[in-house]
């Protein structure tokens, strides 16, 4: 069992001071970027994707795949890094950073992408940052 990330708590004003307006809208207000506009949708370099709000490692690049949905797609997060909460309507499951509770996107299961987990973590590019493989020891 992996260790849980450290909890990061900030006031709304503190989040606004460290995030861009678009990052704040998505991470803290549970917004969504327009499909096909994100920096990491068609990005496939080796490394680790971190939460842009608190820098917690979330995804290995080896779990990223091209789903064609217009947002970065991963089939699995790092152990203990991501929380899941079913939306009230039960149609989707929200994914958030386990450390700072920042909104990442949603996870979908059973879509037939043929990956090992049969899941698609549909993540807003604005919610994540990338660390290349040479500066990362988790790959």
Curated annotation (Swiss-Prot):
Which GO terms are recorded in the biological process aspect for this UniProt protein? protein repair; response to oxidative stress
Per the UniProt record, which EC number(s) apply here? 1.8.4.12
The record's top EC class is oxidoreductase
Q: What is its main location?
A: cytoplasm
In this chain the MsrB domain maps to: 12-133
* Cofactors: Zn(2+)
Q: Which positions are catalytic residues?
A: 122
In terms of Pfam families, this protein maps to: SelR (PF01641)
**How the cofactor binds, per note?**
Binds 1 zinc ion per subunit.
UniProt keywords, alphabetically: Acetylation, Cytoplasm, Disulfide bond, Electron transport, Metal-binding, Oxidoreductase, Redox-active center, Transport, Zinc
Name any GO cellular component annotation: cytosol
Task: Quote the subcellular location field of this record.
Answer: Cytoplasm, Cytosol
Question: Which superkingdom heads the taxonomic lineage of this protein's source?
Answer: Eukaryota
Q: Its catalytic activity?
A: L-methionyl-[protein] + [thioredoxin]-disulfide + H2O = L-methionyl-(R)-S-oxide-[protein] + [thioredoxin]-dithiol
Could you tell me which residues carry N-acetylalanine?
A: 2
Locate the residues binding Zn(2+).
Answer: 51, 54, 97, 100
Which positions form S-S bridges?
69-122
Gene Ontology MF terms in the entry: metal ion binding; peptide-methionine (R)-S-oxide reductase activity
Q: What does this protein do?
A: Catalyzes the reduction of methionine sulfoxide (MetSO) to methionine in proteins. Plays a protective role against oxidative stress by restoring activity to proteins that have been inactivated by methionine oxidation. MSRB family specifically reduces the MetSO R-enantiomer.
Q: Which family does it belong to?
A: Belongs to the MsrB Met sulfoxide reductase family.
For this entry, the protein name equals Peptide methionine sulfoxide reductase B5
Native source organism of the sequence:
Arabidopsis thaliana
Taxonomic lineage from the root? Eukaryota, Viridiplantae, Streptophyta, Embryophyta, Tracheophyta
């Amino acid at each position: 069992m992996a260790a849980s990330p450290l909890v990061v708590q900030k006031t709304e004003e503190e989040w606004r001071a460290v995030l861009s307006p678009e990052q704040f809208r998505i991470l803290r207000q549970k917004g969504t970027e327009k499909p096909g506009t994100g920096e990491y949708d068609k990005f496939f370099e080796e490394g680790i994707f971190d939460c842009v709000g608190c820098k917690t490692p979330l995804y290995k690049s080896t779990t990223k795949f091209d789903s064609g949905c217009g947002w970065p797609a991963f089939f699995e997060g790092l152990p203990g890094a991501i929380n899941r909460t079913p939306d009230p309507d039960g149609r989707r499951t929200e994914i958030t950073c386990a450390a700072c509770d920042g909104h990442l996107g949603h996870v979908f299961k059973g879509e037939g992408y043929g990956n090992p987990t049969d899941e698609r973590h549909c993540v807003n590019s604005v919610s994540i940052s990338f660390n290349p493989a040479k500066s990362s020891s988790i790959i």
